[in-house]
A protein has these predicted regions:
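Structural signal for conserved beta-strand scaffold positions within catalytic alpha/beta enzyme cores
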Residues: 80, 134, 151-154, 210
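Electropositive, gly/pro-rich neighborhoods at or near active sites that engage anionic ligands
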Residues: 1-147
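Glycine-rich beta-strand-to-loop/alpha-helix junction loops that act as flexible
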Residues: 186-189
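A mid-sequence, solvent-exposed acidic-amphipathic segment
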Residues: 140, 146-182
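A short, acidic, amphipathic alpha-helical segment used as a generic capping/interface helix at domain edges
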Residues: 6-10, 60-67, 165-175, 191-193
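C-terminal functional extensions of proteins
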Residues: 191-244
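Structural motif
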Residues: 131, 182-183
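Residue-level detector of flexible, active-site-proximal loop/helix-junction positions
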Residues: 85, 157-159, 215
Length: 244
């Protein structure tokens, strides 16, 4: 596995060279869906999501998400929790062993922690003169991002339960483009995994990137994660597999 900064450069180079790919990421949150572990947070205040494994509809939605996590394709990359790393909250060996093509695995933290400042500096330049759409919370102020967003596809809180239908809007949007490739940035929790997988299956001509909370400070006018404040994982370098 390349270092975190080299992995970031790998994906940035692909964007610069107009080589489409899909990058979806999952970690301890989606791990709860896989293992039916409840998650109870204040979604209204923090733009996060909850999970009640006693709710039958939520179980159905969780299956859609978790089924998508095993998808593999040549141009599709999964960001996972490191198999053996002191920085990651949970061991990623279970994630790692799901996939046959280990070459298409990367760090779930690729846009944050040790890479956070580089992403803030470099991604706006990489996206310059590109057609960019953003899929994220309706309260996100995308006009405050340090790059132009052509369109904002809005979802609400607990989007993985309430906004599955946005897939059709995204299909129509991507279908209206041929070249050059469009860049879709996703920041909608577990729903991102499902949307990116389904869209890539049908159209491999665009960039589908799970950007997560990397630019939350811009769109919400406040930090939502520890690394935004120089705390938590800020500056910490994932090791992938200790000793290798």
């Amino acid at each position: 596995m390349r270092s975190m900064d080299d992995e970031l450069d790998f994906f940035f180079d692909k964007i610069m060279d107009s080589e489409p790919f899909a990058l979806s990421r999952w970690g301890d949150g989606e791990y709860r869906l896989v293992n039916s572990i409840p998650l109870d947070r204040d979604a209204e205040q923090n733009h996060v999501w909850n999970f009640d494994p006693t709710d039958e509809y939520q179980i159905e939605c969780a299956k859609l998400i978790t089924d998508s996590l095993t998808y593999e394709d040549e141009g599709f990359y999964w960001g996972i929790t490191c198999p053996d790393c002191e920085v990651c909250n949970v061991s990623g060996w279970g994630h790692y062993n799901l996939y046959e093509n280990k070459e298409n695995l990367t760090y779930a933290s690729i846009f944050v922690n040790a890479n956070h400042e580089e992403v803030q500096r470099t991604l706006p330049y990489v996206l310059k003169d590109k057609t960019v759409a953003f899929v994220g919370n309706k309260s996100a102020k995308t006009n405050q991002l340090p790059f132009h967003v052509d369109r904002h596809f809005t979802v609400g809180n607990n989007a993985w339960i309430n906004d599955l239908g946005i897939l059709e809007d995204l299909r129509d949007y991507l279908g209206s483009f041929n070249t050059p490739p469009t860049i879709l940035l996703f920041a909608c929790g577990p729903l991102s995994n499902y949307l990116i997988t389904e869209l890539w299956k049908e159209n491999k001509g665009h960039f589908l990137i799970d950007i997560g909370s990397a630019f939350d400070v811009d769109i919400y006018n406040r930090p939502t994660r520890g690394f935004h404040r120089g705390k938590g994982g800020f500056g910490k370098i994932c090791q992938w597999i200790n000793g290798q």
